[in-house]
Regions:
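Domain-level signal for soluble alpha/beta catalytic cores
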Residues: 1-219
Length: 219
């Protein structure tokens, strides 16, 4: 007899006592170094996973947690750093990640706008002519973390390519589909590496499909 399985689209990152916000502000004010910051965020992240496990959730989302913004996470995973920030390739450094979100004295932050019709604001990715490339398989990293630290085989979460492009800027209206086509092989690589790791379920979010899109985009 088949079993009905429970899942969860995502878990609030803020924490019961706003732990996430407090750790973030400590790092921004130079009260903790990067290593301490990452360890403290890991504690919060794994506590959220453990709580869902203890409540009987079968397919626990992994990768929904973010150090700042999940759309920005997707952008940096594909090397999406605006040209005004001194990015030299490879995995995007933490300080560069936050520079995109907050800006520096010489480089303005990326735009923020509402996530659909909610009060949540995300960092708008910018396509500035550089080719997207996979520089870090973040869903795989979160899957391994939960498996190694908690023995949990969860469900990696990632924003789908169509939604990611539609929420971005820096390209002409007619170039959106071409950008999606460039991203598809990179997403395929992410999924292949997850499959090789033994991942059985992946949650790919495409909320843009719930909005009004053109026939051309559908095709």
């Amino acid at each position: 007899m088949s079993k009905v399985m429970s899942s969860n689209l995502g878990y609030p990152r803020i924490g019961e006592d706003r732990e996430w916000k407090k750790v973030l502000e400590k790092y921004w004010s130079n009260k903790v170094d990067e290593e301490t910051f990452q360890k403290q965020m890991e504690v919060i992240r794994l506590a959220h996973v453990k709580k869902q496990r203890d409540q009987g959730v079968d397919l626990i989302p992994l990768g929904d947690f973010s150090l700042y913004d999940h759309v920005l996470d997707t952008a940096v995973m594909f090397g999406g750093v605006p040209e005004r920030f001194d990015y030299q390739g490879g995995k995007v450094p933490l300080d560069t990640y936050f520079d995109i979100a907050r800006g520096t004295k010489d480089s303005p932050a990326s735009e923020m706008t509402k996530w659909f019709n909610t009060n949540y604001h995300y960092i708008v990715p910018e396509f500035s002519g550089s080719e997207p490339k996979l520089v870090e398989n973040r869903p795989l990293a979160f899957y391994r973390e939960a498996k190694e630290k908690l023995g949990i085989k969860g469900e990696p979460v990632i924003i789908g390519p169509f939604t990611f492009v539609k929420l971005s800027k820096g390209y002409d209206d007619g170039d959106g589909n071409a950008l999606v086509e460039k991203l598809v092989p990179l997403y395929a690589r992410v999924l292949k590496e997850l499959q090789e790791e033994g991942v059985e379920w992946v949650q790919m979010d495409e909320p843009i499909l719930c909005t009004s899109i053109s026939r051309q985009e559908v095709e």
